[in-house]
């Protein structure tokens, strides 16, 4: 991955803990079973880039010669994928973590809290190369990134009887990131396949959707004329088309009106599992969800012309006499390819992720089969999935990750995602 002197990296770590519940000043606090404070610091490295990015690569190619005779001979040609950079080295992340482990009331309640902050230096990113090089980009150690957040886990024994028990395990996490430095750059702009633009700016989250705000649609040509706006962009003033907001109030609709219209990072991830046991029966279910975060839904640009799909065509503008809801553009509005908040949607969801039901045979029965245990079970996944109001896609977890979308500087684009499948499974666990 890296050249001489950079092939190996050193990534140390240190951790420590203090069990407060064993100290004398807490020895008489009977309701605390365990109380531990933890702290750690560690450094990790990343070298996950293309092979030999530090070398100028040659590839086999045919060389034609002979004054147009068509005679060719095998030869070599330099790579046109990326420019070499012999100076690239390991990306490193240093993380500080503080945690608390608490068990109380005869271990019926357990709480784990972790707070962390990390800084990634020498980010391995692809940077645009100058045009005279003949290649579009090269790998470089460019800038630094900060992540910070928390994770909380709660475990409770709600009922603990001889024949019946009920336990709950819940967790919630929050993370936010911020670009601290981008080398000599204040920001970078990266473009997807459908002209949508992603901005990477110092002080902002790693990826921000950079596009146009809209205010419904142009209801008629008269509506456009009365606005008094002008534009150098094509297909901006079309009856039934999206009404772009003049963000900078200069009377012109152009690229300077682009602004922050969302990012892909959720506010919270959460999950909760309840488990019940009664005799030989067991039953559990997992609810899981995401709150916040936006997604660029590329499907409307593909499906808006398919008039049989109600989700994309209900209340659509048809004519000045049939304007629909005044917010949904007409079906041949090609400039919807430009990134606008019309296709930026809430990626929040709530799901009944998994349900398990089982029955374990008593020992006196399993002995007859000469096995140590036998359990029959039934599992159902994704029985219920509720997306945020206004989301028009099929799977808020789906992301496009081919081509330019494989870059860490581009995130949150969705197109053609498969629906979330419901899975039913039945089986037997046998231990001999």
Task: Locate the predicted segments by residue.
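Transmembrane beta-strands of outer-membrane beta-barrel pores
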Residues: 1, 20, 41-45, 115-121, ...
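Residues on the lipid-exposed face of transmembrane beta-strands in outer-membrane beta-barrel proteins
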Residues: 14-20, 39, 98-102, 113, ...
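C-terminal beta-signal and terminal closure region of outer-membrane beta-barrel proteins
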Residues: 66, 142-147, 192-219, 324, ...
């Amino acid at each position: 991955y890296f050249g001489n002197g950079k092939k190996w990296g050193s990534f140390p770590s240190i951790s420590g803990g203090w069990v407060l519940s064993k100290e004398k000043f807490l020895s008489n606090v009977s309701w605390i079973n365990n109380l531990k404070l933890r702290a750690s610091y560690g450094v990790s490295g990343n070298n996950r880039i293309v092979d030999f990015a530090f070398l100028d690569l040659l590839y086999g190619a045919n060389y034609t010669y002979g004054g147009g005779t068509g005679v060719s001979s095998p030869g070599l040609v330099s790579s046109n994928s990326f420019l070499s950079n012999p100076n690239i080295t390991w990306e490193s992340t240093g993380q500080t973590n503080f945690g608390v482990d608490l068990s109380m009331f005869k271990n019926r309640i357990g709480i784990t809290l972790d707070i962390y902050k990390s800084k990634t230096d020498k980010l391995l990113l692809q940077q645009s190369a100058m045009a005279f090089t003949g290649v579009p980009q090269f790998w470089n150690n460019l800038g630094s990134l900060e992540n910070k957040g928390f994770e909380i886990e709660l475990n409770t024994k709600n009922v603990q009887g001889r024949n019946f028990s009920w336990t709950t395990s819940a967790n919630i996490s929050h993370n936010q990131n911020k670009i601290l430095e981008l080398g000599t750059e204040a920001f970078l702009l990266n473009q997807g396949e459908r002209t949508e633009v992603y901005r990477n700016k110092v002080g902002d989250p790693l990826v921000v959707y950079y596009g146009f705000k809209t205010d419904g649609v142009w209801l008629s040509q008269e509506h456009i004329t009365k606005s008094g706006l002008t534009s150098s962009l094509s297909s901006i003033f079309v009856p039934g088309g999206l009404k772009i907001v003049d963000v900078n109030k200069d009377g012109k609709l152009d690229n300077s009106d682009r602004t922050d219209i969302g990012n892909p990072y959720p506010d919270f991830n959460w999950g909760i599992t309840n488990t019940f046991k009664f005799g030989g029966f067991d039953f559990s279910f997992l609810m899981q969800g995401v709150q916040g975060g936006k997604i660029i839904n590329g499907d409307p640009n593909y499906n808006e012309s398919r008039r049989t799909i109600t989700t994309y065509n209900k209340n659509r503008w048809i004519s000045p006499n049939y304007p629909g809801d005044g917010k949904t553009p007409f079906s041949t509005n090609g400039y919807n390819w430009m990134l606008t908040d019309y296709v930026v949607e809430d990626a929040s969801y709530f799901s009944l992720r998994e349900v398990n039901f089982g029955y374990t045979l008593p020992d006196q029965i399993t002995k007859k089969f000469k096995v140590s245990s036998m359990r029959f079970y039934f599992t159902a996944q994704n029985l219920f999935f509720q997306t945020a109001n206004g989301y028009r896609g099929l799977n808020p977890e789906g992301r496009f990750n081919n081509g330019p979308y494989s870059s860490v500087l581009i995130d949150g684009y969705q197109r053609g995602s498969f629906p979330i499948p419901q899975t039913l499974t039945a089986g037997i666990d046998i231990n001999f």
